[in-house]
């Protein structure tokens, strides 16, 4: 047993230049630090990220986005409650913080306050045991950590993550034909830089969005997908969902951002705006449909799935459009991974609901959506018990913290979504996974297409 001696929280900046919480935790024998991320496209049921708007700290940072209130809660409420506690009692500590908060969404202390401490506790315990973080996390659930996740690399950004004309939020590639994680990174490297070359040749910019993917002003989703397919081919790989040299495509459409609850329709808002403003090049797409009912949206996805090597779609419908998700699962669930994000917000309560409604076959796991390591692990376990895949995910406002890389390996989740091959806040996670693969040596396993245990 080693007791918690000190916890010090303070404000630092995330990848968007907004404040976030950093915690430094010291025990009798070890030290650790943790930083928490922040999302832009968020589900309404997420645990609350406490910001300073409406408090005495409101003017400290732009838009009242400071987190000094959360920092104070760590230093003045959480630390006194945890001082002297055994750092290896992860779940007991997490439950105590949740009880201290006493609200369903952690709105009193802030999910950002609780999570920062929760992660620091795990890191300190691992450091004290002198074992890698992934090995320590695996032992929390009596597991053996060996599986490197297949990365979903967000190479084109749109939606809330970029100031461009693309409505779907993320266009990703998955190196399914690789034999190791390092080879997956090599494949991604070739495709990413080939895509940059193709975009430049077509007269598009290669500026990047929040998650490091390119953010060109393309006209349609189909045009965007065509660029991806061509980049995969020209890089020397096969745009396919299985087989040798296969590189598949994944989408995060973030459809809650496109939904109107009054009309119950989905609208490609950026596309419509470009048409209304008569932006050059959009006139030839004037007759293209951009507004859909839920059923029409399902059909639209079907056309994309038939034409392109799409293996995964996240948030295909609005977080409250359960019927839309159910229809997607019924029609395409055997051959396409259908991931719930805003639908379930890493919350076991909503994951259970999604399982009962047969709405998805994969859960996106974001540690700050639920706000503690214990609850995150419960979400992963519930997902895997239902033969669904837990996809470990970053947020658009990230930090240099690499906790999620270790988490993916610890629970053999098989998939990770942590941005493109640019921006250090994204690359840090990939570099950590490369290090883990090296440490595991012959024990390391990269499953590629077989990671989709939820598909036939």
Swiss-Prot record:
Signal peptide: none annotated. (2R)-2-phosphoglycerate binds at residues 169, 366, 395-396, 417. The active site is at residues 211, 366. It is an enzyme of class 4 (lyase). Mg(2+) binds at residues 252, 314, 341. InterPro entries: Enolase, Enolase-like_C_sf, Enolase-like_N, Enolase_C, Enolase_N. Pathway: Carbohydrate degradation; glycolysis; pyruvate from D-glyceraldehyde 3-phosphate: step 4/5. One of its GO terms (cellular component) is cell surface. It catalyses: (2R)-2-phosphoglycerate = phosphoenolpyruvate + H2O. Keywords: Cytoplasm, Glycolysis, Lyase, Magnesium, Metal-binding, Secreted. It holds the Pfam family Enolase_N. Binds a second Mg(2+) ion via substrate during catalysis. Its EC number is 4.2.1.11. It is found in: Cytoplasm; Secreted; Cell surface. Belongs to the enolase family. NCBIfam families: eno (TIGR01060). This is Enolase. It comes from Metamycoplasma arthritidis (strain 158L3-1) (Mycoplasma arthritidis).
